[in-house]
């Protein structure tokens, strides 16, 4: 019975994460049609900050370990602030969620290219094919862009750069996610304030 609870916790958390993450683009597009990107993000980060503060109070841990807080905050500035702000502004400027998702789909590939020290021929061929596939989708979608949505494309690339740099920095953090998320989310809230 214990193995079932462990499996349910592991797979349930993973399934919940995938559900929440994948539905994000849909709710983001709905959100920016009814509020500015700044207002929507401020409300989103404020709600998450309250929820994380409640969890922190229950756990009796509010902040990451001393000596890591600046790095954790800088990582949050990129992953929570930079990524989210650029993402929502790209939608607000008219970039479609599909094109935005295709551009951001390059993040794992970009992270691997930057962090990998040795590449096998097979891995390079796979990365090249993945980049070609993404590029064909992005260029097909970008060809329909008008000058007003070109800014959205630049913001999508800034979101990609932010999430890639943040993911690389996050790899150096060896604390539990619940030890770093409250501070990272709070930094995102501060950056999103109008």
Can you say where each PLM-predicted feature lies in the sequence?
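Glycine-/small-residue-enriched transmembrane alpha-helix faces in small-molecule transporters
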Residues: 1-42, 86, 132, 145-172, ...
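Juxtamembrane helix-start motifs in multi-pass secondary transporters
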Residues: 40-41, 179-184
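Residue-level signature of transmembrane alpha-helical cores of multipass secondary-active transporters
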Residues: 13-14, 71-76, 101, 127, ...
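Specific alpha-helical transmembrane segments that line the substrate/conduction pathway
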Residues: 39-50, 84-122, 159
């Amino acid at each position: 019975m214990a193995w079932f609870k462990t499996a349910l916790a592991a797979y349930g958390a993973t399934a919940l994460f995938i559900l929440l993450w994948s539905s994000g683009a849909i709710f983001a597009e709905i959100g920016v049609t009814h509020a500015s990107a700044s207002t929507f993000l401020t409300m989103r980060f404020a709600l998450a900050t309250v929820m994380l503060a409640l969890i922190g109070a229950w756990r009796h841990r509010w902040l990451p370990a001393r000596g890591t807080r600046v790095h954790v905050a800088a990582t949050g500035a990129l992953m929570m602030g930079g990524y989210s702000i650029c993402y929502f502004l790209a939608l607000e400027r008219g970039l479609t969620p599909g094109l935005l998702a295709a551009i951001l789909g390059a993040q794992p590939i970009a992270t691997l290219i930057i962090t990998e020290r040795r590449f096998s021929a097979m891995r390079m061929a796979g990365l090249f094919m993945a980049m070609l596939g993404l590029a064909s989708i992005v260029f097909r979608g970008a060809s329909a862009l008008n000058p007003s949505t070109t800014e959205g494309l630049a913001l999508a690339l800034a979101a990609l750069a932010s999430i890639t740099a943040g993911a690389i920095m996050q790899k150096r953090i060896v604390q539990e996610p619940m030890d770093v998320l409250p501070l990272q989310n709070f930094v995102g809230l501060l950056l999103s304030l109008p």
